[in-house]
Amino acid sequence: MSERNQRKVYVGRVVSDKMDKTITVLVETYKKHPLYGKRVKYSKKYKAHDEHNEAKVGDIVKIMETRPLSATKRFRLVEIVEKAVVL
């Protein structure tokens, strides 16, 4: 019924855009240590489909889970939340 709402959505930073129509997004999350209660930072890289090659390195983007598009690509670009500042 509303299966589309069950998909995972992450916000992360683009760390690579060297591939055609593919970006690598670094997603950082915090988890609480089970015994000591300290927040520990975890990070994971996801490859995402960028149809129009619009995301650049340093951009903050939102990605959504989708069907497998290649051997390693299971996410697609939803929107660019914040553009990187070019110096």
Curated annotation (Swiss-Prot):
UniProt effect for mutating residue 16 to G: In strain: 10
Task: Cite the SUPFAM superfamilies for this sequence.
Answer: Nucleic acid-binding proteins
According to the UniProt entry, its GO molecular function terms are:
rRNA binding; structural constituent of ribosome
Record's superkingdom? Bacteria
Q: Is-annotated flag, keyword Transferase? A: no
Q: Which UniProt keywords apply?
A: Ribonucleoprotein, Ribosomal protein, RNA-binding, rRNA-binding
Segments spanning the bilayer are: none
Reply yes or no: does the keyword Phosphoprotein apply: no
Xref: InterPro entries:
NA-bd_OB-fold, Ribosomal_uS17, Ribosomal_uS17_bact/chlr, Ribosomal_uS17_CS
The UniProt entry's GO biological process terms, in alphabetical order, are: translation
Per its UniProt record, what Gene3D superfamilies does this chain match? Answer: Nucleic acid-binding proteins
Detail the disulphide connectivity of this chain as listed in its UniProt entry. Answer: none
Q: Which GO terms describe its cellular component?
A: cytosolic small ribosomal subunit
Q: How does it assemble?
A: Part of the 30S ribosomal subunit.
UniProt lists the family membership as follows: Belongs to the universal ribosomal protein uS17 family.
- Function according to Swiss-Prot or TrEMBL: One of the primary rRNA binding proteins, it binds specifically to the 5'-end of 16S ribosomal RNA.
HAMAP family documented for this protein:
Ribosomal_uS17_B
Q: What is this protein called?
A: Small ribosomal subunit protein uS17
The species is Geobacillus stearothermophilus
Instruction: Please name the taxonomic classification of the source.
Output: Bacteria, Bacillati, Bacillota, Bacilli, Bacillales
The gene is rpsQ
